[in-house]
Amino acid sequence: MDTVSLAWAALMVVFTFSLSLVVWGRSGL
């Protein structure tokens, strides 16, 4: 696994986490 794919994987994880965090915050959890 090269550095570029690893960086993309990390970016997707962070993006998904922050997006779900925003959704949870908006729904009043």
From Swiss-Prot:
Transmembrane segments: 3-23
One GO BP: photosynthesis
Primary location recorded for the protein, binned into one broad class: plastid
Topological category with respect to the lipid bilayer: Single-pass membrane protein
Location of this chain's protein in the cell: Plastid, Chloroplast thylakoid membrane
Subunit structure as annotated in this protein's UniProt entry: The 4 large subunits of the cytochrome b6-f complex are cytochrome b6, subunit IV (17 kDa polypeptide, PetD), cytochrome f and the Rieske protein, while the 4 small subunits are PetG, PetL, PetM and PetN. The complex functions as a dimer.
Its job: Component of the cytochrome b6-f complex, which mediates electron transfer between photosystem II (PSII) and photosystem I (PSI), cyclic electron flow around PSI, and state transitions.
The name this protein goes by in its record: Cytochrome b6-f complex subunit 8
Organism: Chloranthus spicatus
Record gene name: petN
